[in-house]
């Protein structure tokens, strides 16, 4: 019998993988992006940046920025019927595209 692994990155073999052409250092753009309170953002984990990484279970979720904590943003999401607040670095966030109103 083997003990089950329970680490932070366990069972994320495909989720936290970069494609071969994306490997290496990440561009500086996502590190310097700014978000405003109330703005909707997608949580998309950059596996090459370990600081400020949310738990992989929240990869792909959409939330709302409610504040800042140092360099990080506090993002409110709904998980089941509960609201949760995640502390996430901007490298792991993408702004939600707003549909153009005509």
Curated annotation (Swiss-Prot):
Residues 1-33 are annotated as: Disordered. GO terms for biological process: translation. One of its GO terms (cellular component) is ribonucleoprotein complex. GO terms for molecular function: structural constituent of ribosome. Transmembrane segments: none annotated. The keyword Ribonucleoprotein applies. Residues 1-21 have a biased composition (Basic residues). Keywords: Ribonucleoprotein, Ribosomal protein. PROSITE patterns: RIBOSOMAL_L21E (PS01171). Belongs to the eukaryotic ribosomal protein eL21 family. This is Large ribosomal subunit protein eL21. It comes from Methanopyrus kandleri (strain AV19 / DSM 6324 / JCM 9639 / NBRC 100938).
């Amino acid at each position: 019998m083997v003990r089950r692994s329970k680490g932070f990155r366990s069972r994320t073999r495909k989720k936290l993988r970069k494609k071969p052409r994306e490997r290496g250092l990440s561009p500086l753009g996502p590190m310097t992006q700014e978000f405003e309170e109330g703005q909707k953002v997608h949580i998309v984990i950059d596996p090459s940046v370990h600081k400020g990484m949310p738990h992989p279970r929240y990869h792909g979720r959409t939330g709302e920025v409610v504040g800042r904590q140092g360099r990080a943003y506090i993002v409110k999401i709904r998980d089941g019927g509960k609201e949760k607040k995640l502390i996430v670095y901007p490298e792991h966030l993408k702004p939600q595209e707003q549909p153009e109103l005509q």
